[in-house]
Structure formats: structure tokens, C-alpha cells
């Protein structure tokens, strides 16, 4: 039995997957990161979603299948890691916003040019840099051993929630939706002042 998260784990609504990814581990060679903060980009109603205007060469990995990598460049320098969710043909994903280092700290710091906490891994571009990712990782299956993997972690009972970051272009109902989730009482979380205990319906 493996602790790799299987494809069916990702084949659900992005918000469900986002909540269940908190506490899971991102692993690449000797680097292991615990996921502490995520953002859900849902389908089809989310106007912050990269697929809102249809499929393009840049966002093509976003359309599936689930459980694969969607990476894109932000400001031409930061590689932002997204995990594709939902059914194939739906442009949905979870952005990994922040992580806690578990193993490989020396290599992480070299890749991050000597940065130390708390700014080492609190931001999506920082996560991509710590893992040494580039656009060649697009489409990579996260559920297969080797390369970049996502492994089960200890479930997180209570979550923080708040609006996503940097989506001023979205409709107000999506811009303000509490689709950014994080682990409470963890220093490896960004923009903490905008987060509140998540209310379960």
C-alpha cells in the first residue's frame, strides 16, 4: 500500500481537494514540504480561474486529467504550482500558496538564495523555487512514484479561510469568496490577517 494520493483524490471539486491537501506532503528527491496554505480555483463559475476564457496554449495543462501539474509563470520569473482537480476537460485546480519545510532545508535555502523563515516558503513563487520547478513539469502525474509527488499527511480538523490573493479582476462574489484555506496556528502561512476560522455549512 502506498501513501501517494491517487488520481481519484483529485477528481473532485477544487475546494474539497484544497481542504484535504492541507497537511499533505510535497516531495521531490530530498526536499519534503508540508502543505500549509492553498487556494481553490473552481469550475465553471469562478471568474478568477485561468480557464475562464477557454483553453489556450498556456493553460492547456489545467484542463486535465486530474492529479497532474499545472505550472505557469508569474511576472516572468516565479513558477506557481497548481494541482489539477475535477474531471478531465474541466479547468479546475488548487494553487499551493505556502508550505512548511520538513526535509532538505539546506537545498531549499540554496534554491531560495539563503532566505530563512518566515519568508522562506510563504508564497506560491517561493514554493516553486524551493522545489526547483520550471515549465517542463507541466502535466507531470503527482500520483506516480519519482519526480514530484504528493503524499498523505495527518488530516487537519480545523481550517482558516479567507479571500484569495491577487485576483482583483474577478467578479466580486468570486474575489471575496473564502476559497483560500490554511492551517491554523502555523507560522508558514501568508497574509494571515485576512484569514478567519472556517465556517462549515
UniProtKB/Swiss-Prot annotation:
UniProtKB keywords: DNA damage, DNA repair, Hydrolase
Catalytic EC class: hydrolase
Gene3D superfamilies named among the record's database cross-references: Methylpurine-DNA glycosylase (MPG)
Single GO biological process annotation from the record: base-excision repair
Documented EC number(s): 3.2.2.-
GO molecular function: alkylbase DNA N-glycosylase activity; DNA binding
Pfam families: Pur_DNA_glyco (PF02245)
Cited CDD domains: AAG
Family of this protein: Belongs to the DNA glycosylase MPG family.
Protein name per Swiss-Prot or TrEMBL: Putative 3-methyladenine DNA glycosylase
Native organism: Nitrosococcus oceani (strain ATCC 19707 / BCRC 17464 / JCM 30415 / NCIMB 11848 / C-107)
Record lineage: Bacteria, Pseudomonadati, Pseudomonadota, Gammaproteobacteria, Chromatiales
